Amino acid sequence: ADTIVAVELDTYPNTDIGDPSYPHIGIDIKSVRSKKTAKWNMQNGKVGTAHIIYNSVGKRLSAVVSYPNGDSATVSYDVDLDNVLPEWVRVGLSASTGLYKETNTILSWSFTSKLKSNSTHETNALHFVFNQFSKDQKDLILQGDATTGTDGNLELTRVSSNGSPQGNSVGRALFYAPVHIWESSAVVASFDATFTFLIKSSDSHPADGIAFFISNIDSSIPSGSTGRLLGLFPDAN
């Protein structure tokens, strides 16, 4: 199975797999059962921003999800990613729908990682920014139902021609270049990621959510991972 670390923006409470009984953000380490969650007031049809940071000195992964009206949710979890992830990874965005559905639209995405090495005091950095997504976006690996180019956005899950979200859909987008996320000789490994998103649904219960994830470089969508598994995990263990 893939090795996955993720920050989930979970719109549907699957209490049977340990979700709290409300929409939440959570930090997932190798399992969809979040290590830590925080209540999130998801605003249907409004553009939100997610900001994720990690620093190997503090060994803390943190996320803030906010809306223009100032409403925000914060979650953090102490973890040493050296012990969890391989040295080289890919970073991506994932989303799913199930019986209930929503649009999982990404409007922009940026990422920066830095490795400050002991020996040379140099920093190896990888940085990318997408302020919009073109139809033929060469530097993204699209998996499942993910598509780019509609209105300059990235649609992670299936949307009909009139813009209605479709159920039982899963899609992911990964940056094409592998990221050197840690190195034994590095003094500091850090990264931050930001994406803006629009979740829209006419269902009484939008589902299922969007995640920023880090994985082994050959990661693919697990079979049967629509709905509550967010396109990340093969099962709910």
Curated annotation (Swiss-Prot):
Q: Which SUPFAM superfamilies does its entry note?
A: Concanavalin A-like lectins/glucanases
Annotated residues for binding of Mn(2+): 8, 10, 19, 24
Is this entry keyworded Lipid metabolism? no
Identify the residues that bind Ca(2+).
Answer: 10, 12, 14, 19, 208
Single GO MF annotation:
metal ion binding
Entry keyword set: Calcium, Lectin, Manganese, Mannose-binding, Metal-binding
The residues listed in the UniProt record as binding a carbohydrate, with positions renumbered to this chain, are: 12, 99-100, 228
User: What family does the entry list?
Assistant: Belongs to the leguminous lectin family.
Q: What else is known?
A: Binds one manganese (or another transition metal) ion and one calcium ion. The metal ions are essential for the saccharide-binding and cell-agglutinating activities.
The record describes the protein's role as:
Glucose/D-mannose specific lectin.
**Self-association and partners:** Homotetramer.
| Annotated protein name in UniProt | Concanavalin-A
